[in-house]
A protein has these predicted regions:
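Bacterial N-terminal signal peptides that target proteins for export
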Residues: 1-9
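Classic N-terminal secretory signal peptides
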Residues: 11-14
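C-terminal motif of bacterial Sec signal peptides marking the signal peptidase cleavage site
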Residues: 18-20
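Subset-of-secretome marker
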Residues: 24-158
């Protein structure tokens, strides 16, 4: 019994040290418009100022302006079709009676910023990515990315 207790204490201590030393952080930014809300969630390394993942969640409230429901759904579906097959990008879309939603997750380590074929296939998506993920000194800088999106009226969620 004492051996199990000692082993458990050692494992908890090791876990505490590993988690305590991690410099990974998460930040959220929101852009609220009349009928839409865009949330950007960055996962980044504080010490290295490098982004590892970006999640974009776009929600269109169709109860606020039903005239544009089909146009929004069509535009979302076009963007999804463009994104299919781009390495490092996953997405989910959801429709219900009140909302049209698109969630895009970008794995910065796998995503190819300079892939000309993908860039030509999905110009709207790449323009959004280049706004939200700013490269500096061969990394995607969290601070530079944050400053860029704040210029587009995103607000940091504290």
């Amino acid at each position: 019994m004492k051996k199990i207790l000692k082993l458990t204490m050692v494992l908890f201590g090791a876990l505490f040290v590993l988690l305590g030393c991690s410099s990974e952080a998460k930040s959220e930014f929101v852009l609220q418009k009349t009928a839409s809300k865009t949330k950007l969630t960055y996962v980044y390394d504080k010490e290295k100022d490098s982004v590892s993942k970006l999640t974009m969640n776009i929600v269109y409230d169709i109860t606020k302006d039903e005239r544009y429901t089909e146009a929004v759904r069509s535009q979302r579906n076009e963007i999804v079709a463009e994104m299919e097959g781009i390495e490092g990008v996953t997405f989910t879309k959801k429709d219900d009676n009140n909302y049209i939603t698109l969630t895009v997750e970008i794995d910065v380590q796998k995503f190819k910023f300079d892939d000309l074929v993908s860039r030509q296939k999905a110009p709207t998506f790449y323009n959004s990515v280049n706004t939200a993920l700013v490269r500096k000194n061969n990394i995607v800088s969290y601070e530079e990315s944050k400053n860029a999106i704040l210029q587009y009226e995103f607000k940091e969620v504290k």
